[in-house]
């Protein structure tokens, strides 16, 4: 009886092992498929934005409506190398934009660390640049920005940290990038500008996305949207 019983046990055991291997394989395939889906764009074309509520406008890229849509105006600021930075610096570039200050003890460091992820993801991509505006330009001189860049591994000419005229920077942030969320509360130059938002700007200077610079899933979506925008411009 024992000689007959042991083979049966081995057969049952082999069937169970085979079942567990198949189950693990199926789970692995499902997980990989889930990851693949998450890396695709949400829509055929990213929306366009032109005001503080960030209501999406579904416009066909290259259309007359797109050409007449809100654009970020020209500016003249100075980066960590002491170079003058204007819109010409970003001609034919996709740009990720934010506002920060080097002495920020809280969220700015988290924002910088998340922006570093963007820098690393597109480090060798000549189409993608990063632009960070100091909201304390009287403190964040060229030398201070240079030290900050060195401290956090910011790549010169890939990621521009800029200082300049406070009024110009605040006007860009509030009137053109629409970065502050406290709608309904008028602000003037004396009111401090600070936001955790990242913005995605296309090659034609249009706002194509807004993202929480402190949120991991939002940063992941930004990376996906940058890749979608690159395909759109081909």
Describe the residue ranges of each PLM region.
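N-terminal targeting signals for export/organelle localization
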Residues: 2-74
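Short active-site neighborhood of thiol/selenol oxidoreductases, capturing the structured segment around
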Residues: 73, 85-115, 130-132
């Amino acid at each position: 009886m024992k000689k007959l019983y042991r083979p049966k046990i081995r057969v049952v055991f082999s069937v169970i092992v085979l079942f567990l291997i198949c189950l693990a394989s199926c789970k692995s395939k499902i997980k990989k498929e889930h990851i693949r889906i998450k890396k695709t764009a949400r829509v055929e074309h990213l929306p366009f934005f032109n005001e503080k509520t960030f209501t999406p406008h579904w416009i066909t890229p290259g259309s007359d409506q797109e050409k007449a849509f809100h654009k970020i105006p020209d500016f003249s600021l100075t980066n960590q190398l002491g170079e003058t930075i204007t819109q010409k610096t970003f001609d034919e570039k996709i740009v990720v934009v934010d506002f920060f200050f080097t002495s920020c003890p809280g969220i700015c460091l988290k924002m910088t660390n998340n922006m570093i992820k963007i820098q690393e993801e597109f480090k060798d991509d000549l189409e993608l640049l990063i632009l960070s505006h100091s909201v304390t330009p009287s403190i964040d001189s060229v030398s201070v920005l240079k030290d900050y860049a060195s401290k956090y591994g910011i790549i010169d000419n890939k990621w521009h940290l800029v200082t300049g005229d406070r009024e110009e920077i605040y006007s860009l942030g509030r009137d053109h990038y629409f970065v502050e969320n406290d709608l309904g509360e008028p602000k003037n130059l004396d009111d401090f500008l600070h936001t955790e938002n990242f913005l995605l700007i296309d090659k034609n200077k249009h706002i194509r996305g807004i993202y929480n610079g402190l949120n991991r899933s939002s940063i992941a979506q930004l990376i996906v949207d940058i890749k979608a925008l690159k395909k759109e411009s081909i």
